C-alpha cells in the first residue's frame, strides 16, 4: 500500500491517502444510477385505506441499472495510476436525488405498467408491498435486524449507541412481496444538540410513512414501558399503524426468562404482537417477516426487485468511513464527527478517486483523529478503504482529511446541508 501523509505547520489541514497496488479484476458488472422522472397520468392509488391521509404525487424516483463490461485491456489499464483523465461519476447530481422533506418516499408513485414490462415484472393481484418503520431506543439492534431482513449490510453496525443518524431505506423483495424498511436513529429522551432533534424528526417521518411499525427492545434488560419510544417515534398520529414488538438478543438469556418477559410485554404494552428474536444470528427473522407481510397492503412493487436501497453510492461510502470512526475511537469523538464525500471520480485508466472530509467540533478532536505522526488517521483510512472496495467491488484511491467547524451539531443550516433536515444528499 502506498501512503502519502501530509500535515501543515498550523494543523489546519491534514490529508491521508490510502490506495492498494494490485487491482481486482472482479468488477461488479452493474452500477446503480439515481434518476428522478415524471410519470404519466396513469398513477395508481395504492390501497388508500392504509395510507393514513397521504396522497400520491405525480413524480417518482427510479433506480436505473446500467450494465458495464470491462475488457481485459481495461482491467490492465485500471492498474495504472494515471491521474490525467478524470470523469465525474454521474450519480453526484444532487438534483437527481429525491427530497425526503418535500416528497416522502411513501408518496412516490408506483412503477407503471411500462416500467414493469421493462423489468420483466408480471402483474400479480396477490402481491403485497409497503413501508415498515423500525424504531427503538439506542443500541437495541435495529440496524442488525434490518440488515438480516434485507439479506445484506445496508446500515452500519457498531457496539456504540446512536450509530444510525439518518433513516436508512432498505428493500427486501421476493416474487410475492416487497418490504421497504426504514432503519431509524435510536430514540433520544434527552436531546443535547440540534442534531438530536433533527434525528428524532427522521424517526417520526418514518412512522408517518409506514404501513406498520416494528418496535425493538433489548431482551436482556428489565421490561419497561415503551411509551417514550411511541411518543418520540410515532408522535401524535391520529391513527396508529399496526405495531409489532420485537424482543431482540434472546440468545443472551435463558428460555424461561424469555417467556416471562414476553408475557409482561403482551400484558403491559399496546402492541399487536410480541416476537423474540436474535437479530445477530437470524433467529426469529422469518416470524417477523411473516407478521409484517400480513399487514402490508396488496399492490405492485415500488422498486425493481433487484434493488436493495435507493441511496447513492456516495452516501454508503460516507457511512462506511463513519462506521470505522465509531469502531476506532472512543468517548465523544465519534459523535462529534460528520463525514462528507467531497469528490467521487471514475478514472478509466486508474483507480476511482474518492475524497472524504471528516468534520469535527473542536481542534482537540481533530488532533485525536489524526494521532501521533498521522498514525491514527492512517489506520482509519486503510480500514475504510478496504470496506469501500468490498462494497463497490473495485479498487479505489481514498483521500481523507479532517476539518474543524465549531458547533456544527447546533448549526441548523449546516445540518440541513448535511442531510439531517429530511433530505438524503450525496454527501
From Swiss-Prot:
Ranges for region G2: 162-166
Q: Where is this region: G4?
A: 248-251
* Annotated spans, G5: 277-279
Q: Keyword annotations for this protein?
A: Chloroplast, GTP-binding, Nucleotide-binding, Plastid, Ribosome biogenesis, RNA-binding, Transit peptide
Q: Where is the Era-type G domain?
A: 128-298
Transmembrane stretches, start-end: none
Its chief place of residence is: plastid
| SUPFAM superfamilies according to UniProt | P-loop containing nucleoside triphosphate hydrolases, Prokaryotic type KH domain (KH-domain type II)
Oxidoreductase recorded as keyword: no
- Show the PROSITE patterns listed in the entry: G_ERA
Ranges where the record places region G3? 183-186
- The set of disulfide-linked cysteines is none
UniProt-listed GO biological process terms: ribosome biogenesis; rRNA processing
Question: What are the boundaries of the region G1?
Answer: 136-143
Where does the protein end up? Plastid, Chloroplast stroma, Chloroplast nucleoid
Annotated protein name in UniProt: GTPase ERA-like, chloroplastic
Q: What is the lineage of its organism?
A: Eukaryota, Viridiplantae, Streptophyta, Embryophyta, Tracheophyta
Amino acid at each position: 500500500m502506498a501512503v502519502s501523509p501530509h500535515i501543515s505547520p498550523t494543523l489546519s489541514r491534514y490529508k491521508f491517502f490510502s490506495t492498494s497496488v494490485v487491482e481486482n479484476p472482479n468488477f461488479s458488472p452493474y452500477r446503480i444510477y439515481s434518476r428522478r422522472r415524471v410519470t404519466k397520468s396513469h398513477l395508481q392509488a395504492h390501497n388508500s385505506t392504509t395510507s393514513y391521509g397521504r396522497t400520491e404525487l405525480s413524480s417518482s424516483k427510479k433506480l436505473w441499472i446500467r450494465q458495464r463490461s470491462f475488457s481485459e485491456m481495461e482491467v490492465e489499464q485500471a492498474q495504472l495510476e494515471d491521474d490525467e483523465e478524470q470523469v465525474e461519476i454521474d450519480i453526484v447530481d444532487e438534483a437527481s436525488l429525491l427530497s425526503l422533506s418535500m416528497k416522502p418516499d411513501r408518496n412516490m408513485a408506483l412503477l407503471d405498467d411500462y416500467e414493469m414490462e421493462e423489468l420483466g415484472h408480471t402483474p400479480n393481484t396477490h402481491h403485497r408491498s409497503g413501508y415498515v418503520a423500525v424504531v427503538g431506543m439506542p443500541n437495541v439492534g435495529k440496524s442488525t435486524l434490518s440488515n438480516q431482513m434485507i439479506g445484506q449490510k445496508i446500515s452500519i453496525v457498531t457496539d456504540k449507541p446512536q450509530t444510525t443518524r439518518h433513516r436508512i431505506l432498505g428493500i427486501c423483495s421476493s416474487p410475492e412481496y416487497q418490504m421497504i424498511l426504514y432503519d431509524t436513529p435510536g430514540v433520544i429522551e434527552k436531546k443535547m444538540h440540534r442534531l438530536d432533534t433533527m434525528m428524532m424528526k427522521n424517526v417520526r417521518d418514518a412512522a408517518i410513512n409506514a404501513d406498520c411499525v416494528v418496535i425493538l427492545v433489548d431482551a436482556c434488560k428489565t421490561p419497561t414501558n415503551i411509551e417514550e419510544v411511541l411518543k418520540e417515534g410515532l408522535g401524535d398520529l391520529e391513527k396508529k399503524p399496526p405495531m409489532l414488538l420485537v424482543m431482540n438478543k434472546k440468545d443472551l438469556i435463558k428460555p424461561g426468562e424469555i417467556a416471562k418477559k414476553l408475557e409482561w410485554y403482551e400484558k403491559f404494552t399496546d402492541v399487536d404482537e410480541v416476537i423474540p428474536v436474535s437479530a445477530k444470528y437470524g433467529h426469529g427473522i422469518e416470524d417477523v417477516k411473516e407478521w409484517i407481510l400480513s399487514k402490508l397492503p396488496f399492490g405492485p412493487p415500488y422498486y425493481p426487485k433487484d434493488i436493495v436501497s435507493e441511496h447513492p453510492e456516495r452516501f454508503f461510502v460516507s457511512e462506511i468511513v463513519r462506521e470505522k470512526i465509531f469502531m476506532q475511537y472512543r468517548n465523544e469523538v465519534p459523535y462529534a464527527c460528520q463525514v462528507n464525500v467531497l469528490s467521487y471520480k471514475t478514472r478509466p485508466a486508474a483507480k476511482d478517486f474518492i475524497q472524504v472530509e471528516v468534520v469535527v467540533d473542536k481542534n482537540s478532536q481533530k488532533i485525536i483523529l489524526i494521532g501521533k505522526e498521522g498514525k491514527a488517521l492512517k489506520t482509519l483510512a486503510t480500514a475504510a478503504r478496504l470496506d469501500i472496495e468490498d462494497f463497490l467491488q473495485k479498487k479505489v484511491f481514498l483521500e481523507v482529511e479532517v476539518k474543524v467547524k465549531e458547533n456544527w451539531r447546533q448549526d441548523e443550516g449546516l445540518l440541513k446541508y448535511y442531510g439531517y433536515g429530511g433530505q438524503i444528499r450525496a454527501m
